Amino acid sequence: MQSEITLKSPIFALYVLNDFVIVASGGGNAKFGVKNTLQCFQLSSSGISASPVSEQQMGNDVPVYISGLPSKNIFCISVNNFSIFYSISKKGDFSEIYKIQSLPTANEDLFQSCLAVTPTMLCTGASNGNLKVFSLKFQNNDISAVDLLKENTSAHIRTINSIIVIPEKKILITASGDGTCKMFEIATLKMLKKISFRASIEESSNYFMRDIQYDSYNNVLYTLQSALRGKSFITKWDMYKGLSPISTIEVNDIVCSAMDYNKNTGVIGVVDCEGHLIYIDTKGEMKKIKKLTLGENMIKCGAFYGNQFISGSVDNILRMSKSYTSGLISIGFLFKIILIGLVVFHIYNKKNNIF
């Protein structure tokens, strides 16, 4: 197992699915030597498998976004105007990915930019801001039925970068390059709320919404927004109060590309266009914990695996970064050690009548 793997082409998307990371790389026409591939690597606390456990050649198609269903070991990718479902099958000591179904989920002249999948639905976003919701039915890890439920052709005026589905609230939330983040009712795709961000009232335009993450326990939404060639911020929004802003933190003075939220620790990992990984503690007032320099080139995507962070960069490198607490003893753990020591010392003294 290794902490760093060099692939043959730039990494555009990744998704952590149980003890695997699915990696989409490529970015060009296969006829000119740039292979577009979908690879599956094994993960453990000690690192990433040195070679993929399974691989799919994508020809001229560039996978740009991945979402998944960990409970079913199923994931879905955005390729051109298609959504393609795959499953990870374990046979003895070996695992492999195999294609379940390919669905034309965007119009022929559009590029599908992102998607989100749940056990009952698929939501897709396109390069022109088009938003669609499909119903899904699974049978024995295969898709038995797909139906278009609703389409909103004017959800956004620019590319939709990210979608989050919250089934229990019957809503979905989108982030777009048009500078807005919107909440929609799933059944009708009627817009319920729109939010945007500017660092100061003097600025003339909204920041691009790069990514969104949802904390279901605290009912909080996090948005990552950046200027075209400038600063990046994360804002915490209160879902109980209709997406009212709670606090904002400046992450960096350059463009950040993606983030992921660790629900176990309340920490966000953010990656930027100059090879940095920044950890943000979201408990209470947001604050930066640590900034790591992983390389010199843009890190395009990232996700937590436990407390470790998996990232993929445009210089072909797949990395596992240790937890920000790696090698440190927490105050709580130190207190437990001291307490146990005092108890043992007390028992020893009592037996030997030292005092």
What residue spans do the PLM features occupy?
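Juxtamembrane amphipathic/hinge helix adjacent to a transmembrane helix
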Residues: 278-329
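A short beta-strand motif characteristic of beta-propeller blades
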Residues: 1-5, 51-57, 96-106, 144-153, ...
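Repeated scaffold domains used in trafficking and secretory/extracellular systems
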Residues: 8-13, 59-70, 107-114, 158-163, ...
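Loop/turn segments within WD40 beta-propeller blades
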Residues: 16-19, 66-72, 114-120, 163-170, ...
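Beta-propeller domains
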Residues: 1-4, 20-56, 80-95, 138
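C-terminal single-pass membrane-anchor helix
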Residues: 325-355
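WD40-repeat beta-propellers
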Residues: 33-35, 39-42, 83-88, 131-136, ...
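Conserved beta-strand element within WD40/beta-propeller blades
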Residues: 22-25, 30-31, 75-79, 122-126, ...
